[in-house]
Structure formats: structure tokens, C-alpha cells
Amino acid sequence: MRYLTAGESHGPKLVGILEGVPSGAKIDKETIDQALQERQKGPGRGGRMKIEKDQVTILSGVRGGLTTGAPIALEIINRDWANWEKIMAWGDEADLESRKVITPRPGHADLTGHLKYRTEVRNVLERASARETAMRVAIGNIAVQILEALGVEIRGQVLSVGKVHMNSEDTPEYWQRVQASEWKVGDPQGEEALYTQLQEARSKGESLGGVLQIQVQNLLPGLGSYVQWDRKLDGRLAQAVLSVQAIKGVAFGMGFAAGQHFGSEVHDPIGYDSGRGYYRYSNNAGGIEGGMTNGEPVIIEAVMKPIPTLYSPLSTVNLETKEVMEASVERSDVCAVPAALVVLKHVAAWEILQAILEKFPADTWDELDKAWHDYKRFVSER
């Protein structure tokens, strides 16, 4: 499978094309739209989210609610385009002077993109914007729906925002609280502190980052491979996660803490049960060993830096005069950590489904479903 996205933050549309999705898989448009709406939520979101009402239009590759095997084309309308139509026009009528950016923002693609492509900063930030992730959520939700049909569940939580850290549990009641929370946390006291911290950041013209966790449940062992570097599933998941705007680090299972312990304290002892097959007594590896799933939940943690647009701007250099000035200010969020969690779940889903289709090549849903359950039976009896 593969996909491409196109579109600018303030252009007319975001578009995406997926190829390699088996035919006969059930796809529900409303479920995609619900994921897009989740991405727009969060206490720290900016004014743009009051304008956009993201919904996907499926242009091809799905008929009667089932994939056809043909490329799937998607589009999402940018409602804010109405306010930028003259500025972002493709032809000679484009107003290139309005909203021109000559003071690049530290931490953003502005300056480096300007130098690399020898183009205006406006052109750089329009494509580099996290607005692009709306289409990646739509694309990834197709993978989510196929994974759920196989019994694979992807869930996530926010572990910290700024200096506020959550107390995490692993109970059904805890995950219900996470799902109901605006912040996607299950710690009520910690959540109160998040609102206080958000207000402080907003009043100071600051932004906030955080740490997020994704869990992929009910995967079979053997997805990915150890035989070549580019087939290792943790490497591919790491690339997918780090490709999301503002994500600066990724870890699996125990992560960086593994470097502070003896091997006997890190590696997960193996057990066997006639009903479930092989299993681990712990999951410090985060469900991946040797670049392959081992049957335990895949646990991914990622760190999101604070958004680089600051309403109390840092210093920068004027591209025309070379004078030191304040960086430009674009409309932005104070905190988008819960929204990033939605994006990470969907980019991870795409990589997981791709690994499944490499293990079980299939042109149709029925072939994939049969191969998955045949292998599941083999693993449990081995």
C-alpha cells in the first residue's frame, strides 16, 4: 500500500490518493468524519477550528460501502479558503504581497524551506502546516476500520502536557475516562492542573507540548521482519510517527529507561498457555522484538514539542533587511497535544495494516480475513 497527500493550509482543498487497499473491505464515511472531528477538538485549539467542519468526500475506490481495489481518492474542503482565495490563487491574479512573511519563525520550516526551494516563506508554511494531517487522519481511518474488522484495536492517551504529568492506569474504567476527557487523560486531578497550565500559557503568549502514548492491541506475532533494515516494524512506525508535525522523539515499551537497568530487569520472560500460545510475563519491549511484533500490545510513546508559532514571538532576522526583528505570528493553537494523539493513532494504523498485508498478501478482504485467522489458529496451537 502507499498514499500521497496534496494541498495547502489555506488552499481550496486537501486531497489524498491511496493504492493497494484490498477490495471488499467495509468502509464507513461517517466513521472517517468522526475521526476528523476528534482531530479538531482539544482545549488549546485556535480559531481555525471554529471555521473548519472537516468532512471527507470519497471520490473513487469505494462503492456501496465496499472498497473496489481501485485507487481511493479523497478530498477535504478548507472552508477558510474563502478568506484566502485571492492570496492563494494559482494564477496571475494571486495577491503575492498580502500576508507576505519575511520574518521566519524559529522552530518552523519557514527559513530552511525558503532556502531549499528558493520560494517565499508563505509557500513553505502553507504546505508544512499541520493542516495536512487532516488528510492523513482520513487516509489512516480506512486502515483503522480494516484493522478493527480483524479484531485489532488502537487506543491512546496523553501522558503529560508541559510540566503536568498524569497518573496512568490500565483498567476499563480508566480508559473510559480517557475517552471522555477533552485532554485524553484518565487522571481527574491531573486534568484540572492542565486547564490551569493552559490558561497560564495563553496569558503569556506561549505554547505547550507533551508526551503521548499509542497502544495497538490484539496483533499477531510476526508482523515486520528482521531480515532487512527497512522491513523492521519499529523502524517503520518510528518514521511514521516522527513524520507528524512537531513530533521530536519516539520510544517503544520501556523506551529510554531501558538504558538504566540490567538486562534481567528489561527483557520479558516467555510463557506458554495451551489456549493462547506463547506470551510474555511483562511488556518492556513494547510488543516488538527483532523488528517484529511478538504478540503483546505494541506500545509507542512520542514527544511533541511546543508549537513554534508564539504570540510572544522570539527574535528572528528580516529576510529583506537582515535586521533582527520579532518572528511573524500566524493564527495557531496554544496546545494541540490531544489532536496529535488522533493523528498518531492513524499514521500508526496505516503502517500496521501495511505490515499485515506484507505478511498476508491479499487482493480481497475475504482472502485477508481468512489468512489472518488461519495464522491466528496456527500461532495458538504451535
UniProtKB/Swiss-Prot annotation:
GO terms for molecular function: chorismate synthase activity; FMN binding. One of its GO terms (cellular component) is cytosol. It is an enzyme of class 4 (lyase). Transmembrane segments: none annotated. The keyword Transcription does not apply. FMN binds at R127, A128, S129, Q245, A246, G290, K305, P306, I307, P308, T309, R331. GO terms for biological process: amino acid biosynthetic process; aromatic amino acid family biosynthetic process; chorismate biosynthetic process. Pathway: Metabolic intermediate biosynthesis; chorismate biosynthesis; chorismate from D-erythrose 4-phosphate and phosphoenolpyruvate: step 7/7. NADP(+) binds at R39, R45. Keywords: Amino-acid biosynthesis, Aromatic amino acid biosynthesis, FAD, Flavoprotein, FMN, Lyase, NADP. Its cofactor is FMNH2. Reduced FMN (FMNH(2)). Its EC number is 4.2.3.5. It catalyses: 5-O-(1-carboxyvinyl)-3-phosphoshikimate = chorismate + phosphate. Homotetramer. This reaction introduces a second double bond into the aromatic ring system. Belongs to the chorismate synthase family. NCBIfam families: aroC, PRK05382.1. This is Chorismate synthase. It comes from Desulfitobacterium hafniense (strain Y51). The gene is aroC.
